[in-house]
Amino acid sequence: LRFCVLELQVVGFRFDLASVLGRVSAHTFDPQHPLLQAIMNDPQLADTKRIAEPWDVGMGGWQTGNFADGWQEWNDRYRDRVRNFWLSDIDYARRASAAPVGIGGFAIRLAGSSNTFSAERGPLASVNFVAAHDGFTVHDLVSYDVKHNIGNGEQGRDGADTNRSFNHGTEGPTSDPGVLAVRRKAIRN
């Protein structure tokens, strides 16, 4: 990390599956883990941004909101609630003839997820995102209701099953100009 900062002028790092860096046992995460503290307390790294993807694949790996002050975290609760508000609520309302969940859950996320991040850390600890390198792309979110991970050898076991997506009437690729237009509009929204 020091080499990247001092020699390459890197100003920040995103740590993939970052909760593994704070593991003290197979199922326990410690936000004060010596490795995390060493990164935080290194004077040559003091001015860098530290962004954690606050989960890993192990038991007890989901740690959104639990990193120490000085870390920012990807906020998957924001991602999921925005996707619900943007796409899933519409889909649910159409299919179930019921009112969508509404704006309440969306508002708490948009306002900084105070129920996830402590007051000491505040809303700037949250890195809000809708799509990333894992899971559905934005195009997938408006084109598929379910994942189709068959061709990669995992028989569909990989990836999340709850993508909170809405295909706008046709699953996957289509040449229907009406479906394509509404998908493009949804992406712009």
Regions from the language model: what does each represent?
Residues 1-24:
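Active-site groove signature of glycoside hydrolases
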Residues 25, 30-189:
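Conserved alpha/beta catalytic core and glycan-binding cleft of carbohydrate-active enzymes
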